[in-house]
Amino acid sequence: KRSPLPSPMPDGTLIRTPLCRTIVYSSVHCSLLGEWNKLNCIAGVCDLNYMMMPAIHKRHQEGKLIDLGNSMTPDAEKMITINPDAILLSPYKDNGGYGKFDKSGIPIIECADYMETSPLGRAEWMKFYGMLYGCESQASSMFNKIEKEYLTYKSLALKSKSEKRPTVFADLK
């Protein structure tokens, strides 16, 4: 995190890793950080009332984590007060940019994992998050386990001769 920067620096957003103080919009990403014992790196969340993670609520009650309100209109002053290393959020189509946050100097990391069309593509994003938080080996190990299980079940399903296969629903709304 403190290593010297190359010169000249290319255009783009500089993110120094590992991230130690972040704002996280999604309970999916909070859960992943929980798996790696990195909940202490979450300084703020949006939509706390929708997060079904007792550990996140406990950290909020202890004053270790700030509720920033609705993810579509988060409390900008609280976000800036947190002084995060980065904001992890899900990009929305036609959102018109990030307003005040674009000018705040806080790096914005668009977590587009939910846009992946394959389960393994979506799962592989954990390697990216692992790099951000210094959990590369944990992320790689977790992904390898998921990949192995997925391929096993996929192979099993392809071998099924039954015309009456069960229907699977995901992403309940």
Residue ranges and their predicted role:
Residues 21, 64, 77, 81-173:
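Extracytoplasmic substrate-binding proteins
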